[in-house]
């Protein structure tokens, strides 16, 4: 927080606006642009690692028709592990403090939606399409690659969207283990007294929330683009029925 922002007013919201409008806070080394690049790079690496782990397992279990309980167990166990606890424990291993430990911890957090949606996507494939493919002599691997996987793409996109938004929002905790990212701005604000650092804390929170919403919006468009129109209509009807059930209408 600059001295100018601190003098401009005691309202932390006003201080946050001034801080965000200071060009030096964007362009200086360790400024917003640098932290944004760190945040995006480690989030992308974590989601990619989660995909490499979760998608093959989910697709194969969905193809085999077994392991639904295992998918549920893995999802529940990984969701039950606090990300902050992982960020605290992993740096004490061979990964050390810094980016690798952060990426692994965030990847664990990304696994549940990726795994569950991969499994569900394959299981929801049209049984008639499966039977027709088997009738054409396709092997199990060919059936998965040529029939089930293309039909599962909308579900994979939905899982990717959920995982990416969760990881981007949670990556702010990386600053606690010297991982960088936008959370470093918030942490630096807490290092100042509240009168001087309150605006910087709010500004950092706004940046993290804004980035998460931007990722959500972009990936929502991608998910819509890869989802066939009939499936979009079916999901819309299901969502309306669920909303009606909740409201009692």
Q: Which residues does each PLM region occupy?
A:
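Transmembrane alpha-helices
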Residues: 44, 140-174, 203
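Membrane-spanning helices that line or support transport/gating and their immediate boundary helices
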Residues: 59, 117, 121-124, 128-131, ...
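Transmembrane alpha-helical segments of polytopic membrane transport and secretion proteins
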Residues: 1-19, 30, 217-249
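Loop-to-helix entry region at the N-terminal start of transmembrane alpha-helices
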Residues: 31-42, 91-113, 153, 200-204
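Short cytoplasmic-facing helical segments at TM-TM junctions of multi-pass membrane proteins
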Residues: 117-157
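Hydrophobic alpha-helical transmembrane segments of polytopic membrane proteins
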Residues: 182-223
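Periplasmic/extracellular loop-to-transmembrane helix junction in inner-membrane transport proteins
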Residues: 2-47, 194
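Cytoplasmic-entry segments and transmembrane alpha-helices of multi-pass inner-membrane transporters
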Residues: 57-90, 106, 116-120
